[in-house]
Amino acid sequence: MYSRKQGSAGDSMFRATIDRLIANRHLPFALMHRASTGNRLELLTGELSTIEALDQLPDPDHDGDGDGGARHDLLLLMPFRQIRERGFECVDDRAPMWLMRVTEQHEADRDTAVAWLPDHPVVLSDAAFDKDDAAYATIVRTILSEEIGRGEGSNFVLKRCFLARLDHHDTAAALSIFRRLLERENHAYWTFAISTGEGIFIGATPESHAMLADGELCMNPISGTYRYPADGPCANGLVRFLGDRKEADELYMVVDEELKMMASLCEDGGHIVGPVLKEMACLAHTGYVLRGACDQPVRDILRETMFSPALTGSPLESACRVIRRHEPDGRRHYGGVVALIGRDADARPALDSAILIRTADIDPQGQLRIAVGATLVRHSDPQSEAAETTAKLSCLLQAIRGDAVTDQPDTPVHATVLGALPGVQAALRQRNQSLADFWLRAADSRRRQYGGQLSGRVLILDAGDNFTHMLRCQLAAMGADVAIAPCDGAFAMDRFDLVLVGPGPGDPQDADHPRLRALRRITRQLLAERRPFLSVCLGHQVLSDILGLPLRRLAVPQQGVQREIDLFGQTCRVGFYNTFVAIADTDRIEPQGMELSVEISRDALTGEVHGLRSERFCSLQFHPESVLSRDGLDVLRYVTSQLMYSPHQVPRTATARS
């Protein structure tokens, strides 16, 4: 039976339940403050179990119990190892996926309820990082040289763990930590204490994972960290941070990754709102909000959004391999998700979820573990990344220890006015000036602006990077009928007017990798059958190699780099994600035995090839679909229309295209 109490009766039940939980440490519960609930605390109790996969997630309860209003049915704690459900690699540390069927839900005013919580001192012993700064910096250097430097991806998140032992670790101690977090960290997305009856999770996470409300899916990519100086944040320091290209690049790459997720779940993909400044007690982050209409089941949303690129890297599948190689002890729940699943007042599915970061994981023996990480990009400084992990730990650690709050009552961090400091809003707006307008427009605006510019059927071959879903959104918005198929799967190319050989991670010269073998076979077939095709990034590199152009590893990878280039006589600002590049010393080649004349767009100084084109194909080293490609949609429209509608194209009959 489901029970929910509000008002004075709810306050009494809330307080009585707190007392009951303190008296019995083995009762499972969830005590939360969520940004979407205003000044309310929520207290949930229920039946706790574990499940192995999201397919075992029960459907929301619609049995009519309760008051008929909005309600929570399920609380889910997803460990990082669930990424296996997407077929990605991970260390299987056997961390459980906890599921609570909510039977009681109580609410109380936050300011009132805080006074009902204990405020006991907590003593830590044997406190230290599992990897000191020097050891962490060494691994950072290894990832920069051996992973990013070899083309495995554009950015990766490396964690380390702060370990300690709590001398007292009962429910009263846990609620004391929660109380101090509430008092110190006013701007978290979720602040929570969740007991499994065995261990407990206590955290203040700044980052939403995914929210479904009124048929709209929202995600909140956050990246880039401004660490407050000892004397507090200031306008000049914050504006310098907002103008730092390294910090902006981190965020843009995360936005691209989450746009991929939105594009796989929403028919029209997501659109970008922001940027926004996420203020926390000890630091601030930059982020965006992504929105899109979505009719997918909650379990599918949770599966397809495993897990935030801000906590893994890009491309996601490649990032998981890198994490497995460099974090042999596993991640447990770090980077996983805590989710509330239920229904709204109109009985529609509802989801609110947060990323499990800035979270203490305390086991039944009182062993505390706090995982923190930093995003590594091509120009990361190892010592600075180590310092960033320490900064991310500081507020939670202060709340655990009960350290005195620094007396800075007039600083912006306490007044919550960082966004109002001189120059900050202009610096935030400036971040959008070089981004692709397509992703800044909502779906209806895109249809009005771009609809009807293309027709015909396009087959996108997925080579292991979900940028393909963003390409689908752009082509579909312009009017094309688009299908996606794995490059190593079965498909009928003769049913389509154009084949797009998609991007993917890896070394284009790796003759043994199954995906690369498939790309070579397909590209040779397209050339032999003289079918119109467009190749992007890895597909472009494979084509270049087949045509006889040498490939070279870049000394400095172009991962998440925006450049202004000359593309066949047109100036374009576009985004690159590549470690390898084709090289040419001429503007045209005629490959031996192919009866082709191929025009080359290249950097006049370095010989790096930006694109190739011939009568029936075109290729692009950059990603026209990336949020970094300000002119990407114009390029995509031009090359696809040229390939589909040029005189060589034989019209398809209605039967052949069905």
Which residue stretches match the model-derived regions?
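A short, well-structured beta->alpha microelement
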Residues: 14-15, 49-66, 476-493
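An anion-binding catalytic pocket shared by soluble metabolic enzymes
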Residues: 26, 34, 160-249, 342-369
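Non-catalytic accessory segments adjacent to catalytic cores
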Residues: 36, 46-168, 172, 214, ...
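Contiguous alpha-helical scaffold segments within structured protein domains
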Residues: 103-127, 165, 226, 234-324, ...
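Conserved hydrophobic core element of enzyme catalytic domains
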Residues: 292-419
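Acyltransferase
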Residues: 416-453, 625-658
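Flexible gly/pro-rich beta->alpha loop and the following alpha-helix that scaffold active-site loops
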Residues: 457-459, 465-535, 541, 547
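Pocket-forming structural segment of enzyme catalytic cores
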Residues: 520-536, 540-634, 638
